[in-house]
Amino acid sequence: MKLYKIILSVGFWLLTTQLTSAQENNFMPYDQAILGSPLSFKMVPIQGGEFTIGSAANEKGRNADEGPQKKLSISAFWMSAYEVTRDELDIFLKDESTSLNVSVDAITRPSPQYVDLSLGMGKQGGYPANSMSQRTAIMYCKWLYQKTKIFYRLPTEAEWEYACKAGTNTAYFFGNNAADLDTYAWYEKNSENTFHKVGKKLANPWGLYDMIGNMTEWTLDHYDATAFEKINNEQLLIAANDAKYPKTLKGGSFIDPAIELRSAKRFHSDPIWNRRDPQIPKSKWWLTEAKQVGIRLVRPFLEPTEEEIKQFFKAYLNL
């Protein structure tokens, strides 16, 4: 199993950076227009800081892979206020200026879905994009970079959990009482087995909607059940991994019970998510058994160089 050593560097990833006054003035919420369309998406600033990743040993529903808890330092970034919608993703899917080949250096447009993987739950008007592979999610980020000249990517697991917890240490960002979930999340009990338009529940304390429930969200990380045991010096080092499975997801979804929506809960991808795909070889782009999987974007405050961005996409799309 090969690890691509692009260990995520200072300012680019997880080392805390104190922002200057001038930088603070530029670290504001903004709306990112998607060129060639009337659509935009909102980005929320997330200040850097320290937090404790994982769950307490006595947290109800805790799994062994959520520990041991470790303190991490996180650098500043923006995160999308909402999950990426199908309306937004469709602009990429229908962009005929992109390639249909599989070159790593090209912006490669995913092949069409074999069947409608929204399964009648909703596509236009603010419904979340679903059933895409991690590769599709990262290629969408590469396409956005081409269109906007701004580097967007998936969050690391640590960034995601830091943003979800929003300064809290409880099972959920609103406390420990799962009875309050209806206010913040679509999950097994209230979803009627369908995903819902983004942003219809209350946001977490940092202004992020649907962080728990609705869609389980991809992160960059390869899943390792013992990852937290390997954290040293308050840093979680991430490298691109050429194994297709398993990758880490966070947040729980509309099909999950309340206990699965805890901030520290970890999910991982599984080959059975493509079990019903009739194509040979099976699609790199779509997951026939993962109707609950979606994405959310981040943008590091300190922009990496053009060469670093090139190496990032080369590593993560050469899987």
Task: Report the location of each language-model feature.
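Mature N-terminal segment immediately following signal peptide/propeptide cleavage
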Residues: 39-53
